């Protein structure tokens, strides 16, 4: 299947990765991540080979589809930029999402209420999600991880090399992974593009929305006729219309001068 521009699915996906800066790594390099690095820029930033990123993405999607029950897949993100992405990924694929703090012992301590026994674990960052990766090793659970150039690969079975620190990159990677899973399951045909936009997986700061709404309320002009009608609708006070209170009921004692004997 190719798009209107004549691009293959691989070329189209890599083009989106370039736009979302998936290829931008870090200045540090893990020894086991050298195989996924294409080159090093002049500023010291390592550039990730997107061809290998696409290959690992396809492999990860096939592993996810091989699990019969989608609820046995747990996707984790302790990084705030990946919280919305994992929730959307779980929504469209049927997996379980854990966004935010990981409760220690979820995979090893059967006493706690949140104990779970998944068959596959997907993490956004092996460094920030180190607790879940460590517990998966104890429970013999395979791990798929989005790995940057400086990410440790200990206890990671499938490493998808990408920029796991940018919100655009994280959103696109989970979007591509969810799209490929739905393609392999036959939920959506490969001849048609997925009608869900990448923006749905993109993290949004709630504080920015509040500030934007406040700015819109302040900049919204008020119609002059509404202001006039507001004041016109107010009923006049009755005590203001009573002229006798000001004219007829004047205290007569103030009119007559005070006699000198009273002083």
UniProtKB/Swiss-Prot annotation:
Chief location bin: cytoplasm
Ribosomal protein listed as a keyword: yes
GO BP: any one term: cytoplasmic translation
Keyword entries, A-Z: Cytoplasm, Ribonucleoprotein, Ribosomal protein
Record PROSITE patterns: RIBOSOMAL_S2_1, RIBOSOMAL_S2_2
Ribonucleoprotein listed as a keyword: yes
Cited function: Component of the ribosome, a large ribonucleoprotein complex responsible for the synthesis of proteins in the cell. The small ribosomal subunit (SSU) binds messenger RNAs (mRNAs) and translates the encoded message by selecting cognate aminoacyl-transfer RNA (tRNA) molecules. The large subunit (LSU) contains the ribosomal catalytic site termed the peptidyl transferase center (PTC), which catalyzes the formation of peptide bonds, thereby polymerizing the amino acids delivered by tRNAs into a polypeptide chain.
Subunit structure: Component of the small ribosomal subunit. Mature ribosomes consist of a small (40S) and a large (60S) subunit. The 40S subunit contains about 32 different proteins and 1 molecule of RNA (18S). The 60S subunit contains about 42 different proteins and 3 molecules of RNA (28S, 5.8S and 5S).
Family: Belongs to the universal ribosomal protein uS2 family.
Protein name: Small ribosomal subunit protein uS2
Organism field: Plasmodium falciparum (isolate 3D7)
């Amino acid at each position: 299947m190719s798009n209107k521009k004549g691009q293959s699915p691989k070329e189209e996906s890599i083009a989106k990765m370039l736009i979302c800066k998936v290829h931008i790594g870090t200045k540090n390099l893990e020894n086991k991540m050298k195989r996924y690095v294409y080159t090093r820029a002049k500023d010291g930033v390592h550039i990730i080979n997107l061809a290998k990123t696409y290959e690992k993405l396809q492999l990860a999607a096939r592993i996810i589809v091989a699990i019969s029950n989608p609820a046995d897949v747990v996707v984790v993100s302790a990084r705030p930029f990946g919280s919305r992405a994992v929730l959307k990924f779980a929504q469209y694929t049927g997996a379980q999402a854990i966004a935010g703090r990981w409760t220690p012992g979820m995979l090893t301590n059967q006493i706690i209420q949140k104990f779970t026994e998944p068959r596959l674990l997907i993490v956004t960052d092996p460094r920030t999600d180190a607790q879940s990766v460590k517990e998966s090793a104890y429970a013999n659970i395979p791990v798929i991880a989005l790995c940057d150039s400086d990410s440790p690969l200990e206890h990671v079975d499938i490493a998808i090399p990408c920029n796991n620190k940018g919100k655009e990159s994280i959103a696109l990677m989970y979007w591509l992974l969810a799209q490929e899973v739905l393609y392999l399951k036959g939920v959506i045909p490969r001849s048609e593009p997925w009608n869900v936009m990448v923006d749905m997986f993109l993290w949004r700061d709630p504080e920015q929305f509040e500030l934007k709404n406040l700015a819109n309320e302040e900049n919204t002009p008020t119609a002059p006729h509404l202001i006039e009608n507001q004041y016109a609708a107010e009923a006049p006070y009755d005590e203001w219309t009573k002229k006798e209170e000001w004219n007829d009921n004047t205290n007569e004692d103030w009119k007559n001068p005070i006699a000198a004997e009273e002083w």
